[in-house]
Amino acid sequence: MTAVTHPGAAPTSAGEDAREGLGIAEVAAITGVTPHTLRYYGRIGLLSVPRDAAGRRIYGQAEINRVVFITRLRLTAMPIRDIQAYFRLVDEGPGNEDERLALLEAHRDTVKARITELESALGAIEFKIATYGGS
């Protein structure tokens, strides 16, 4: 784990950590998201990651949780622009929960419709497998 320094924080001695966190390679290994993608998320404003004194990104639990949630949203085919809109609202803080809720509910409806389509397609595949004597 590497120490993170925050702007305006008092300098710490070599053994005194301002904050512990994980480097980009460790987060990539934990989340399955490539370092390139993690950097991309930062560039497009989805992820703001503090840096240590040497300029390396240091991910805390909040950043890791965000990466995991972004990954789940992407798995459901939520467009990047919608994920950006959601996290813009989150980053603005309290007062826009209704907008966040509406965005997530709309996406949930899209996901449920897609699941229904996939279940129908799976049924057709299962039928063909049974036709050929498979199980």
Regions found by a protein language model. Give the residues of each.
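Arg/Lys-rich, alpha-helical DNA-contact motif
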Residues: 1-24, 29, 48-49, 61-135
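Conserved active-site tyrosine of GNAT-family acetyltransferases
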Residues: 41, 59
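Glycine-centered, phosphate/nucleic-acid-interacting loop/turn motifs that mediate DNA/RNA or nucleotide
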Residues: 45
